[in-house]
């Protein structure tokens, strides 16, 4: 049986990724200028990684037969509806940076010999990769070339 602390930590990580900004943006697409569709694909890629991580964590949590709470999207996300891809990619960079800091903090609470530690570190690795991809996508932005 998973210790309650680790269960709560994994539930928090699953919730952070299940109701993440990239996931929200798969439902409320930003405005994309013609020719920038390839840059917009990064949103779907990040959201897919978040979904896969949540699925992996849920397999562990569901075996515990305890209630799982993933929550709702934050209402603040609606402020980003219909904004440009350039702006959204910058917001996603800030979001992923905050997520990375949160995950690094959470990693300090977890026993290094646990499954939770492996999943937290997987989430950290994903966040680092997402930040690299976002930096590249933001570098391709016409707004960043002025």
What are these regions (language model features)?
Residues 37-71, 133-142:
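Conserved alpha-helical segments that form or flank metal/cofactor-binding pockets of metalloenzymes
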Residues 3-10, 85, 140-146:
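Membrane-interacting alpha-helical segments
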Residues 34, 63-72, 95-100, 113, ...:
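Short alpha-helical linear motifs
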Residues 1-47:
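N-terminal leader/targeting helix
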Residues 120-146:
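Short, contiguous alpha-helical
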